[in-house]
């Protein structure tokens, strides 16, 4: 009877009491009407979407390094390889400063621009660029170019009027840095170029002043490796007006070749154009020397100009007007507004005069000494005391003293000519 009592509620449903599973049936209408086996497949389909999101982030993580690589490295494998060697380069050189930039990594824009210049100077050859960068870093460590500008001073008689630095602006406000070498201002060739180390330091100091004006350490944009225009380059002007000694002077030849060699190694890709103005015909040897040490990309930037007054014509109107009048512009003379290295007057002549006086002073002193010695002899009172005593002992003493007196006089006589001989 108890089972029959349970059947009435089951009888209320259209299914017989044998089908106890209709209790699960209400869950089926929530899904599409498919086979009864869908109940067992549903847990598998529900687990699949849970695993999918766990696999997707792994694929994204693997793709992140390639996506985060800067374009200037992704598009330039040689530059990327160059940066891979940078830690070893800095370790080998023992120095990390180049042109005011502390070399760091590929995320530092000023560092990237420096690396691009060294790589371009070697036409993309990573090994050659590495060797040159190491040499340049070692050279800067030894030479300390920053100190040559900040603390060193140079002879005004040797280098005064020989080098200048100017900065002009074009129509867009962009600055153009120009270094000037006025070789016609050299007064004494051997004094200016005779000491090669001194001349090179002066020339490096002028170059470093120009490099500072480029402001490479303040760069915020990576320069285009393949672009012809480089915002971190300067102009150089060499004026040979009234120069007639270049053909035969060996000191100038040696200084010029050494400067070209050092600058090609230590300052690659910093030159936009170089103008040789008022050039005499005998200077062919200098251009031949430049081709030996400099690349074709650099020598193609050289422009000889026979008349210096035509220099300003090489530039657009807003810029050429700022050039000095002597070079075809309307600007002031270099001596009036250009900058230069720290020059000081030579104190050497005054020092030499004082040395001569100091050497002569001791020679005069001995001449007076023998004159004073005879004056001291009468001060010896024992000679007079024995005269007052009538004893015979006193006579003996006087005879001994009189015997000693000639010896003292002889000594005075022999010593007197000695100073005279020194004076001669």
Curated annotation (Swiss-Prot):
Heme binds at residues 183, 203, 238, 240, 274. Its main location: cytoplasm. Keywords: Cytoplasm, Endoplasmic reticulum, Heme, Iron, Lipid transport, Membrane, Metal-binding, Microsome, Transport. It is found in: Cytoplasm; Endoplasmic reticulum membrane; Microsome membrane. It is a peripheral membrane protein. CDD domains: SEC14 (cd00170). Residues 42-56, 411-424 have a biased composition (Low complexity). GO terms for molecular function: metal ion binding; phosphatidylinositol transfer activity. One of its GO terms (biological process) is regulation of exocytosis. Its cofactor is heme b. This is Phosphatidylinositol transfer protein sfh5. It comes from Aspergillus terreus (strain NIH 2624 / FGSC A1156). The lineage of its organism: Eukaryota, Fungi, Dikarya, Ascomycota, Pezizomycotina.
